[in-house]
């Protein structure tokens, strides 16, 4: 009695010294982990089961091929026997000769039959070994304790192993009254036992073809009879593959674990949500009429613009030459000389010059300073070469530079002419269409496309200035309203397969035509105001269009001109006559795309990461 009391006191002291290590949060985490592990193992078993079904189907197809080959050999043997009988009936061949031929062919026939039997025996042995492999894989499963997260619908009884090695271990469903015992234990255990009898099958035993399907689905030993088909056999709770996948996703969600599929979707969503951000703006009051690209050599992105007060500004998109803290962009170079607004700017690739056309009807050639010191940047440059010949406003300029040909400067004016110039100022040719006003132009290697106010685009040969063809893309704005609403503002010729002609209109319509077939490929109304500028992405089938209110729309180059996104203007303008232009350039150094938008009040520079 004393010993029992002393032991009890020692246990109480030990219990007081040892703290309780079990907490509610720890138990919940442990149970969640065990549930996740059980669900994962169950999903792996379901996947392995599906793979085994595929393997069984492959074996069945191989068996069908072997049976077909055997049937073909039997038919061939019957045909040979029939031909032999016909030869024996022939009167021209004696019985002695037939007997000699028969004796010669008999060993060969016997050999063929023996080979066929050997092939059939080999095939059946291969199928039998495959069945042994399937039974081995299905029976060699680990002992798994299922935690009862959900109430089981059936109990599973595991019979004890017997000493007789010829007896197979089967799993028989118990009646529903055993369900209470399972719930009392809070778990049920499934034991898998290896079928030892399958390893003792001799090579002389052959599987009957009639029982092959039943043997694959429910393997039996050679000494047992076939079970009844009504008897249901199971080894684990019945779950479909879809149910197990859904259960796994639910478990992952409860444990706050992100699946690989969700990770890929989140990455794609982040890439899709990448937007343009405003980086620089010019001082308010910089009224821009036109924008062009790359006037300066080097890797720093730059552009030139013309203003209403006759000034040409050259800008650089680097943080050193701009006030990055305030987000203000400053002109790098300034040229002045036009008597009125600058309507167009063009920069050739071969020389360090800038061409500009103005409201005063003149074209001016400006030289970029070789040494761009602080003095040349701070002061206004006024020296220029004047090209005279136009009698009215010069609206568009285009530098046409083709290999092995002299470069040509093309100009479009309100005086009704399109003229070609040398870079030195000498006029080469003049294209005029009687009583028609040119509105816009675009050039390829050997032809120039000119849009007129009668709604037609006329194609001329650059060498001979001869009209090649024409097609209608808009209404005749020369007759006044309502056709003036469909007036052409700008055209762009893009080479490709096929060559396409893009047109922007006064009524906010954009159209795409096939140049060769003159067929309308796409048409879309994207704004209620006039469209003024267009710029194409370098490495993707996308382009941007600017409207007269300063807004920018991004479209895809497909049959529907799908809208991608839009940039709202900083201050929407009520008037629809305020012009704007747009430029889209890539910067390989900092891996950024730049979008320059020039409107009435300012120049805005947006950028985003380069999208391959």
Swiss-Prot record:
Record keywords: Coiled coil, Cytoplasm, Repeat, WD repeat
InterPro entries: Striatin_N, WD40/YVTN_repeat-like_dom_sf, WD40_repeat_dom_sf, WD40_rpt, WD_repeat_striatin
SMART domains assigned to the protein according to its UniProt record, in alphabetical order: WD40
GO cellular component: cytoplasm; FAR/SIN/STRIPAK complex; mitotic spindle pole body; nuclear envelope; old mitotic spindle pole body
Protein name in the entry: Uncharacterized WD repeat-containing protein C1773.01
Pfam family, one: WD40
Biological-process GO terms, alphabetical: asymmetric protein localization to old mitotic spindle pole body; negative regulation of septation initiation signaling; regulation of signal transduction
